[in-house]
Amino acid sequence: IRTNGEGAYGSDPLWLEREPTRQEVIDAIESANPPSYSEIVFCGYGEPTERLDDLVAIAQYLKAKYPSLPIRVNTNGLSDLIAGEPTAQFFKGVIDTISISLNASTSEAYCEMCRPRFGLKSYEAMLSFTSQVRDFVPEVVMSIVATSDTPETEIAACRDICDRLGVSLRVRTY
């Protein structure tokens, strides 16, 4: 998706020339008239939990000002490894939905596809985070991208993982 254009699925451009400050993010959201949207989503061509403190502070601001506006985070689920500590509890009360990129049914396939900087332990860390965050976020979803070449057995294996974790699976077609 990153190589196909500036944005994805009709979004504004997702590439940034620099990291905006927390206040710049809030100002940009405010200038877009948040009540006119059905949801605020933290996502992009980077990992939003790389700036977990900012993400949580911005979400707290939005929740206080627009309590009925749902907030979602799309994540790779590696925030515990990024932060070096458990992070699921930080989402409590400020995030309504978290979508975690499962991407594959095995750690080997996951690492081949995603090339995480933390290596093979990334897959188990992502599954562990998913299990933990269920206690703090009302809706937890895992996602995979399926093409016409994706075997049904792979989709079924991913669905089994989600069933074991007690979360939903979203299959995105590409």
Predicted regions, residues:
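N-terminal pre-triad scaffold of radical SAM enzymes
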Residues: 1-6, 39-42, 96
